[in-house]
Swiss-Prot record:
The gene is hpaIIM. Monomer. SUPFAM superfamilies: S-adenosyl-L-methionine-dependent methyltransferases. Residues 32-356 form the SAM-dependent MTase C5-type domain. This is Type II methyltransferase M.HpaII. It comes from the Bacteria. Keywords: DNA-binding, Methyltransferase, Restriction system, S-adenosyl-L-methionine, Transferase. It catalyses: a 2'-deoxycytidine in DNA + S-adenosyl-L-methionine = a 5-methyl-2'-deoxycytidine in DNA + S-adenosyl-L-homocysteine + H(+). Signal peptide: none annotated. Pfam families: DNA_methylase. It is an enzyme of class 2 (transferase).
Amino acid sequence: MKDVLDDNLLEEPAAQYSLFEPESNPNLREKFTFIDLFAGIGGFRIAMQNLGGKCIFSSEWDEQAQKTYEANFGDLPYGDITLEETKAFIPEKFDILCAGFPCQAFSIAGKRGGFEDTRGTLFFDVAEIIRRHQPKAFFLENVKGLKNHDKGRTLKTILNVLREDLGYFVPEPAIVNAKNFGVPQNRERIYIVGFHKSTGVNSFSYPEPLDKIVTFADIREEKTVPTKYYLSTQYIDTLRKHKERHESKGNGFGYEIIPDDGIANAIVVGGMGRERNLVIDHRITDFTPTTNIKGEVNREGIRKMTPREWARLQGFPDSYVIPVSDASAYKQFGNSVAVPAIQATGKKILEKLGNLYD
């Protein structure tokens, strides 16, 4: 397995403009091992490698995400983690399990909400891997909506399994916002961490927000952006009419222009994710329509953010390779984790495990 710590990928900050750099202590490098489940394009991996970890297993079923992952880390993730043949490749021992698993309801039907009640969901596979391998710690990430999903029953079941069935110390989950950790994106996610009873850990504090606020101007493309990212006058007119219709009904849905000194909305897949993060950039010099622009290029400087800007919103370094189409890149970064927020929390986990690596 190629180790990214051996090349230049992570020799620069974890994000082009973030406050998170690889740990300077050379003795920390590869001081712990971790596995990367539902790996996507490797946001968790970058964060944990920045902290000195070595990834010894990864899984991701989406072929386009696998392509991006391999281009950046040199190894192809295993596929469907629900399959026993995939689980068989997981090394017996590793220190930390990382997973950004999807939110799914459980068919509890009045049961106690235990391990077997989660069968058939992707969380079941995460829990089963924890049960089999007994890592020292785990770090799970999910959408903020998990907190109230199914009237809170989903999260309650997850915590019950982790605490009661698996015997881990699991502090109350925290809602962590990426904007507080060096990236200009209002992205709230729920973090769940846990520690094996053998570690003796019985308390945990999530990281405090940083003082520094980063805005879109800090991550804007340095060079003139290609014309293809600019909207047509016709499409802008459609967006404005669409927004007016919704506002007349009392809805807040619609396109939004992020000012240079502003913070982006959470980047998401679908649901006008790109249109909710439009920007004004007057550096355009070529107003010749491209194949994906129907009609005239607008003269107001309104454009979509580029995939590289979305990468920066998530805290990916500029050396991170984007080998896929724009459409795939938007999807991949929209589904990814915010690297600096993951890294800040990962550092807190390692501080608790610190005595194990002295």
